[in-house]
Curated annotation (Swiss-Prot):
GO terms for molecular function: structural constituent of ribosome. Component of the 40S small ribosomal subunit. Part of the small subunit (SSU) processome, composed of more than 70 proteins and the RNA chaperone small nucleolar RNA (snoRNA) U3. The lineage of its organism: Eukaryota, Metazoa, Chordata, Craniata, Vertebrata. This is Small ribosomal subunit protein eS28. PANTHER family: 40S RIBOSOMAL PROTEIN S28 (PTHR10769), SMALL RIBOSOMAL SUBUNIT PROTEIN ES28 (PTHR10769:SF3). It comes from Danio rerio (Zebrafish). Pfam families: Ribosomal_S28e. Belongs to the eukaryotic ribosomal protein eS28 family. GO terms for cellular component: cytoplasmic side of rough endoplasmic reticulum membrane; cytosolic small ribosomal subunit; nucleolus; ribosome; small-subunit processome. The keyword Cytoplasm applies.
Length: 69
């Protein structure tokens, strides 16, 4: 793996749980706010139990999930 292309791991706090997604509802769509610059927030899909206030470790911080319909 090329070390120059590796992104740093970012911490993000769950600010709002938006709903369930996936073919069987196995993922939860959440809005997260980055802890290093708190004015930036994105929507991510999370697998497993999650609630507001949880801190997620994001290996890929640029990818954003499509919104629920």
């Amino acid at each position: 793996m090329d070390a120059s292309r590796v992104q740093p791991i970012k911490l993000a706090r769950v600010t709002k749980v938006l709903g369930r997604t996936g073919s069987q509802g196995q993922c939860t769509q959440v809005r997260v706010e980055f802890m290093d610059d708190s004015n930036r927030s994105i929507i991510r899909n999370v697998k497993g139990p999650v609630r507001e206030g949880d801190v997620l470790t994001l290996l890929e911080s640029e990818r954003e999930a499509r919104r629920l319909r």
